[in-house]
Amino acid sequence: MVDKIIFTVTPIFSIPPRGAVAVETWMYQVAQRTNFPNRIVCIKNPGYSNYTFVNDNCSIHRVGFSRIYKRLFQKWTRLDPLPYSQRILNIAHDFPITKESVIVVHNSMKLYTQIRKRAPQARVVIHMHNAFEPKLLEQNVKMIVPSLYLKKYYQSYLANADIEIVPRLAP
């Protein structure tokens, strides 16, 4: 039984999005309707606060990177001392998560792999909204997909994966 969820996505758009951003919009809609405690962790774009209270069960935590940090650690040296994946885990640790808590990574195999490496004991699920070749995923991955097509697609690569279909319903 799941008692808490951390929703996260690639560090491109802040949540709630100010434009047509399907994955981020879907995640925001689901998180605010979920009946148990959850957190959304996303990147902090200009004009957004670090934290937003949504309701009693949901809040948004935005991770910011300074221009100097991005330039020095992410572009020049590629030696990122506190990457996005670790910042997500720090927020999860402050939640505090339990053995029943789940981190749901949306549409990013790279981010999923980074979180798994940094927290192998954590219950991490990847929610794939698109068909990408799963080169970075382990064979026994736990995955959520929105369609039978995607379930069959990923099962053709990952025979031992635990894949569940959760259809996308219009908010």
Language-model features: locations:
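Nucleotide-activated donor-dependent transferases that construct or modify glycoconjugates
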Residues: V2-A20, E24
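Short loop/helix-cap segments at secondary-structure boundaries that form the rim of catalytic
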Residues: Y48-N55, Y112-A119, F132-N140, Y154-Y157
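Short His-centered aromatic/hydrophobic patch
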Residues: Y84-S85, V104-K110, M128
